[in-house]
Structures are given as structure tokens and as C-alpha cells.
Amino acid sequence: MNKFKYLLFLVVFAVFFLTFAFFDNSSKSHQDDDEQKPIILIHDVSPVYFKELKEIVKIIDKYHYQNRSYLFLIVNHANKYNLKNYPEFVDYLHKLEKEGYHIEFHAYNHIDDEFNCNKTVAEEKLNKSFKILEECGFNPKKIKYFIPPRYKLSEDAEKLFLGRNITIILENKMITEKDGKIVEISITNREYTWYLPKPLVKVAEKIATTDYKLSIKENRKFFLSIHPKAVNYGSGLEFLDYFLNETSKN
């Protein structure tokens, strides 16, 4: 009898262990799949492109990419479009944030290579920018990523952002600070929709799919950069719809 109970215990334990292992591995596999999906970087988010942003968001929402989409804001575009003066646009950004979109920082006015400057100028612009964000109801402490305009920035500006625990995203790498050391991480950051004409959309789709698969194979994060207005031209949105559909299947 004792032997029977012991065998029964082993069977029950084995079933429990295998079930747990299956669901644990399934969960890890699902998490790994999600981590491999593209991260969408939306540059130049400002009231100037309100209509265009809505068109982009419609496609992102269609494939449930909200949590992997990052909105890089220009807080005072061309020194004419201060976020404080556009409450409807700000409310829309808050709505997107609640839905999972990430609010990040791109520029103060986006004039020239504005953060390719000395420490004093960089600090002044960043402080002004964060003040505007606060006045619009955003929490600057939640800003984790920065894309410099035209991917240009000085060493002084780099130190400033890293000192505030903000990771810098460039064309082929991310720069961050870990345990007091500056770390550079290789990434794939591509833009296929810069005023993409209709005849080239299929070519862009094939190139993007190849780049994405190669990035996964080489264990690099894949970033899809898009600019409002540029992506809304020609077949840009058609490409975006295709690419998110393909990558959402993983």
C-alpha cells in the first residue's frame, strides 16, 4: 500500500512538474517573441503634424503595437508651436500615453543640430523643454530615451543626457550609462518611408523584412524610425501596414 501511495505521489508530482515547465516555457517563448518585435520610433511629434500622427496611430493600433511605440516630442517646434498653446494635441498625447505609447524627448525647437552645442546651451534647452512638458502635465522623470535632431550631438550634450539617466538613440547604436560606465549597444535602426513613392513600396517591404530577420538572427534590437508627413506621403502608410502585419505574426 505504501509503495502504491509512493508511486501515485511520483506520478502526480511528475504531471505537475511537466505542466508547470510547459506553461513556464510557453510564457518565456511568448516574452521572447514580443522582445523580438520591432520598436517604433516616431520622430518629430508636434502639433504641426497632428493629422498625420492620427493616421500613423490608426495603423499602430490595428496591430496592437502601442506598447512598442515611442513618441519623440518637439516641445516648441520652430519656436512657433509651443505645446502649451495646443491643448487638444496635448490631450491626445495623454490619451496615447494611457493606451501604452511612450512619451520621449526629441528637441526643443528642432532648428539645425540644436544639441551639437556646449554644456550651457544644452542644459538651458533641456531645462526649458522639461518645464514645458511639466506645464503640459507630463512627468519629465519618465523620459527614458532621446533622439537628437539629425542624430547629431556634442560630447557635452551626451554627458548631460546620460547624467539624467536618459538613453541616447542614434543611427546604429544606443548610448547609455550602467554602473557608472558609458555603454554602447549595437542596434538596427532603419527608416524606409522617407517620402516613399508607390513604385518602390514592394522593394522597401522586401528590404525591411530581410533587415528585420537579420537583426533577430544577430540578436540586435530592431527599430523602425518614421517621420510624420514623410510616412504619410506616397505609399509610406501602405508599407507601415504591411510591415506591422508581417511582424505581428511572430
Curated annotation (Swiss-Prot):
It is a single-pass membrane protein. It is found in: Membrane. InterPro entries: DUF2334 (IPR018763), Glyco_hydro/deAcase_b/a-brl (IPR011330). The chain crosses the membrane at residues 4-24. GO terms for cellular component: membrane. Keywords: Membrane, Transmembrane, Transmembrane helix. SUPFAM superfamilies: Glycoside hydrolase/deacetylase. One of its GO terms (biological process) is carbohydrate metabolic process. Gene3D superfamilies: Glycoside hydrolase/deacetylase. This is Uncharacterized protein MJ0505. It comes from Methanocaldococcus jannaschii (strain ATCC 43067 / DSM 2661 / JAL-1 / JCM 10045 / NBRC 100440).
